[in-house]
Amino acid sequence: MVAPRGRGSRPFNSRGARGGRGRGQRGGRKPRFETSRVEEVHHEASSDGESGLSEGNVDAEDEVELIDELSSGSDDDDEEDKKTSKPYNTLLQLFNAGQDTNGPARKRRKVEHSSKKTEVQIKEPEELDDEADLSESEIEDDEEDEDAEGIAVDEGEAEDSGDEDDATDPFETHFSNVDSSLLLQKINVISTKGWKTHKNELPGKFRLVLSHPDTGGDAVQLPPPAHGLQSLKLKQKLANHAGDHIAKFESLTSGLVPYIFGYQDLLFGARTLSNSAKFRDLYCLHVLNHILKTRDRVLKNNSRSQKEPDQDLELRDQGFTRPKVLIILPTRQACVRVVESITKLYHAEQQENKSRFYDTFSAADDKSWEDKPDDFRELFGGNDDDMFRLGLKFTRKTIKYFSQFYNSDIILASPLGLRMVMDKEDGKKQDFDFLSSIEVAVVDQADALLMQNWEHIEYVFSHLNLQPKESHGCDFSRVRNWYLDGQAKYVRQTLVFSSFITPEINALFSSQMHNTAGKVKVTPTYEGAILDIPLPVPVKQTFSRFNSTSPVKDPDDRFKYFTSAVLSSLVRSSTGSGGKPHASGTLIFIPSYLDFVRVRNYLATSSQTENLSFGAISEYTSVRDVARARTHFFSGRHSALLYTERTHHFRRYQIRGVKRVIMYGVPENPVFWGEIVGFLGLDPAGTAEAAEGGVRALFSKWDALKMERIVGTKRLGNMLMEKGGDTFSFV
């Protein structure tokens, strides 16, 4: 069964460059994942057709480039080269036979395979898309390709090898040199929720809570701030370019970088327009560093096993499948921004299918949105399609877009796009083995994903790091022990960036972030959205607290309080003499769609509200009905208007005619508080009257996270625990 989109039948159409809603949809062929790893070129081509240029073409080009390089000393013409190519190659092989195996011997082997590679180039491109993940056979092919480019023999690469030999490198301590007994001890502690916490404050009024497994050992010391890239264990290839784009770390960044590059989980609840690009560059640098170190470790171990064939080597350096990084994003345009960060940090000579990527993922901003808020334009600007997926594969010289998932290093996807791949339409076959070896998972703009369908996020994380159903040609002798023991989810690093934290995001932090290295939560200290109201006159803002015994009963308790304490006064103010309707201009803001349906049905059927005329706008309301409801409300034909938070998130309407605001619940996004209250001032002539009507909001103790953002951190405690009254007013 196809997963629900999460926006329902809303009229908020995506504006993708080609109008598509992701691969395999609207007449396209369904995506399929191959169960083999390294296929012969005569195998059936992928039905996905995602790979574009073939691997064979690149290899053949590299062969030609290498032969040209070796033959550069000859001044003979082309015909003479053709006549003497075999004797020359034979002579070259004899010359190289006595040389050091670390250098020319590799190139000799490359020349020996050149004719074979050229044959592969002749094959159909789609046949070559049936490549597999990072198995022994494919890495041998890659190794030959990399040898030609100098990955293992150049002096520059030799400098990089020092990073991998550094015992203090977090990559080594977290993934390679793992004490199995200590790992198991930490896992047992985590399974019983035996976390020990340390609290700290960061510059800029940020609160940090570090949790780590309490194994009874020495106290965990908070890492010192990182003041520059030189303090990080970066591959030289990245360090050479990162300094051009990532300046000296600011106070907040310097405090968080050690946790990110130290492979600890991070929940950052203070993402803003000003810091989003900085953190995006940081996590892109981190995942690139991880990919390069993983790849080079496998290549070097392959070289070692070839040099010592008689030795019984224990080389545990791989997972079950190739993909190591998963980045979850809300829109295609957000994916473009991440890819741009990756490409500026990883200088590739070639980018295969780059034009196709920008044609299908990027779009121009809507010029009619110039009056929209900045956060809206950042989220929905460009291509706002929320169903996509993209595989990226990295070689020494090339970034390959649209690589098959099982042949990719990084997977970028929206929750819906990933869910559509994991669950086939026929419901008969599920495929999520490509998520079995994810070692770094990133969720960016988590607050935006909440407004899509958070259940997709929960579904994806519940399928991360599971034992694969099929072997996919895996060489189990090279798989790390903690993969074989089913412990990968305790080693995986998860990074979540959000503008604010909700109960759903907290649940993800508690239930899916089990990193044995520890996890960190960062939240800001809030001054309160009530202080930033865009009106020229003061507005009375009243908060009414109702009692609720549990989160499960909260919807019923809220509805009971609304109908008994709030609705009665609304009906009186909206009814004139003789029971005739009187326009009151009351906007009823409802965060939850389920609550919206409940209130709407009650207003339509209850005898208590038989004289109350109202309109309703939700995320599922058609454009025509939205226009009609807004017109009737502005003209006074409707006394009240129901309005949901998700509607405001997707459309940011400016509702005119508002003289009073009732909030059935406070919004999750604190920005919405000022925007909704600001409706009172859209008609300058009635601003004073609207200010008298003011705002009334309902809340319970289960709304603590939302209320902190609205009223401020310092005021929250008294409002939740105050026993002297249940009503709080601010002007």
From Swiss-Prot:
Lineage: Eukaryota, Fungi, Dikarya, Ascomycota, Pezizomycotina
Protein name: U3 small nucleolar RNA-associated protein 25
Native organism: Blastomyces gilchristii (strain SLH14081)
Bias (Basic and acidic residues) ranges: 31-46, 112-125
Subcellular locations according to the entry: Nucleus, Nucleolus
GO biological process, one term: maturation of SSU-rRNA from tricistronic rRNA transcript (SSU-rRNA, 5.8S rRNA, LSU-rRNA)
Disulfide links within the chain: none
Compositional bias (Basic residues): 18-30
Subunit description: Component of the ribosomal small subunit (SSU) processome composed of at least 40 protein subunits and snoRNA U3.
Family per similarity comment: Belongs to the UTP25 family.
Polar residues biased stretches: 86-102
GO molecular function, one term: U3 snoRNA binding
Domain of life per record: Eukaryota
General function of this protein: DEAD-box RNA helicase-like protein required for pre-18S rRNA processing, specifically at sites A0, A1, and A2.
Gene3D superfamilies the record matches: P-loop containing nucleotide triphosphate hydrolases
UniProt feature, compositional bias: Acidic residues: 58-80, 126-169
Residue segments, region Disordered: 1-174
